[in-house]
UniProtKB/Swiss-Prot annotation:
A cellular component annotation (GO) from this entry: cytoplasm
UniProt-listed GO biological process terms: gluconeogenesis
Name by which UniProt lists this protein: Cyclic 2,3-diphosphoglycerate synthetase
Substrates-to-products reaction catalysed: (2R)-2,3-bisphosphoglycerate + ATP + H(+) = cyclic (2R)-2,3-bisphosphoglycerate + ADP + phosphate
HAMAP family: Cyc_PG_syn
UniProt record similarity statement: Belongs to the cyclic 2,3-diphosphoglycerate synthetase family.
Keyword annotations from UniProtKB, A to Z: ATP-binding, Cytoplasm, Ligase, Nucleotide-binding
Length: 461
């Protein structure tokens, strides 16, 4: 985000307060050392006796601005004023009925997208702090929630880019189980076997952390980082990702992917952004609150989990319309995930451990059996629930000769461990994003972002 003058303030006021009351509040703000640049009236007329801007400005001794329609919040003027006056904080001195929860989230989105704090009498939203530390072109992969496929898309994207001779990509990932010191994993050089990851787990590492999955599935260099907590607009409480990103400056790479965690956003400045939206998520999560904030950040939006069993055609159509209304400039690609084992499972009797919902188990079973010549004995959708996963394994382990598992959650310390202890083969499984029809070209959309990131980075020189 652009650096702002944190002491420079835009006040949002209304006509539901008498001017002397509002002026007292403005004076109080300035008594704390802030510089109120402008008063913007955002609605309400009950106590608004005069709309003569010159008279009101003289009373407040401040520039005053009105929208054309006093019954509507002038969102466009809020954004224009932030930019024109280079304010670092928007202070909301309004109240019901002029504003409500939805309106305030809309205002917050505008403020945060423009690098401003948005503050009211009992709330405060801070703009994302991004460190500009990379010496190579970069893109972010962030999401509107957890378990929507960020790591799968990140690995797929890295593999795709790695096929292009112009690029040597790497992935910097932060996770809730990441290392205390940023960790380089040479996915481009080492073979990550179940036994190797089990040894890591036995030493206390979270061997199913995102950067291990990235390294195994993408076969590119990864840097693993940690983060704790995630704010409503994506800021983390603590992370070592900035240090991890800086490490890439000394590596033999020329493109950096910054992978978010859950709905938390990497605090490192990137040239382009890919935002993942889960087709299974409630509509209001995406169109209300800070859903629009994340969607507006995107240059490319990938909607995942668009199987009709998860996201009905009606919902998807509605989602496409609403996302386009929020961010008309972003490319949008709806996708489904399909499993892809990293090793041969031909003629194997398998138990497949996944985070995919039970509603699509029959699709996954058919896909695996038809494409990989195996027999799916059972599928457990409890990879992120250790007790239930343990139960599923115990019920089926005597009937299988291969454990097929995604590399996340309890994949190593439960699924891999139990299978190896029984002398069974363990094969890890990738999830491949596939566009829902030929109208969309996922690979082309991704590579467009990559080349745009390179172009944007080169323009800085």
């Amino acid at each position: 985000m652009k650096s702002k003058n944190s002491m420079s303030v835009l006040c949002l006021v209304d006509g539901e307060h008498y001017f002397p009351v509002t002026k007292s509040a403005v004076d109080k703000i300035e008594s704390k050392g802030y510089d109120v640049k402008l008063l913007l009236f955002i609605g309400g007329t009950e106590k608004l006796r005069d709309t003569n801007v010159d008279i009101i400005s003289e009373m407040f001794n401040k520039p005053v601005l009105f929208g054309q329609d006093h019954s509507k919040v002038p969102y466009d003027l809020i954004e224009e004023s932030i930019k024109e006056y280079d304010v670092g904080m928007v202070v909301d001195l309004s109240d019901e009925p002029v504003v409500n929860y939805s309106i305030r989230f809309n205002i917050a989105t505008i403020a945060l997208l423009n690098g401003c704090m948005y503050k009211g009498s009992d709330f405060e939203f801070k703009a994302l702090e991004e460190e500009d530390v990379l010496n190579n072109p970069s893109y972010k992969i962030i999401g509107t929630g957890k378990r929507i496929g960020k790591t799968a898309v990140s690995a797929y994207t890295a593999r795709l880019i790695n096929k292009d001779s112009d690029f040597v990509p790497c992935v910097v990932a932060m996770g809730r189980g990441g290392p205390q010191i940023p960790e380089i994993v040479r996915g481009d050089k080492i073979h990550l076997t179940p036994k190797y990851l089990m040894e890591k787990s036995d030493k206390g590492f979270h061997a199913a952390s995102d950067h291990w999955e990235d390294a195994l599935m993408s076969r590119v260099l990864t840097v693993g980082c940690r983060r704790c907590a995630g704010g409503m607009a994506g800021m983390v409480y603590e992370t070592n990702m900035v240090e991890g990103a800086m490490m890439t400056n000394d590596l033999d790479v020329n493109l950096v992917a910054l992978e978010g965690s859950g709905s938390a956003i990497p605090p490192v400045k990137a040239d382009k952004q890919i935002v993942l939206v889960g087709g299974h998520q409630p509509m209001e999560t995406l169109t209300e609150y800070f859903g629009p904030y994340r969607i507006k950040l995107a240059d490319l939006i990938i909607i995942t989990m668009c199987d009709e069993q998860i996201c009905s055609r009606e919902k998807l159509d509605d989602l496409l319309i609403k996302i386009h209304e929020i961010n008309p400039n972003a490319d949008i690609v709806p996708t489904i995930f399909r499993p892809h084992p990293v090793d041969d499972i031909s003629n194997k009797n398998i138990l497949f451990a996944t985070t995919a919902p039970e509603s699509v188990q029959h699709l996954l079973k058919d896909y695996l059996e038809e494409n990989f010549n195996c027999n799916v004995v059972a599928i457990s959708s409890h990879l992120s629930n250790r007790p239930l996963l343990q139960r599923d394994i115990e019920e089926n382990i005597d009937n299988i000769d291969c454990m097929l598992t995604e590399l996340k959650a309890a994949a190593v310390d439960v699924a891999t461990k139990d299978a190896l202890n029984k002398g069974l083969e363990v094969v890890y499984c990738d999830n491949i994003p596939i566009a829902i029809n030929d109208e969309y070209d996922l690979d082309k959309s991704i590579m467009n972002i990559v080349y745009e990131a390179k172009e944007s980075f080169n323009k800085k020189d």
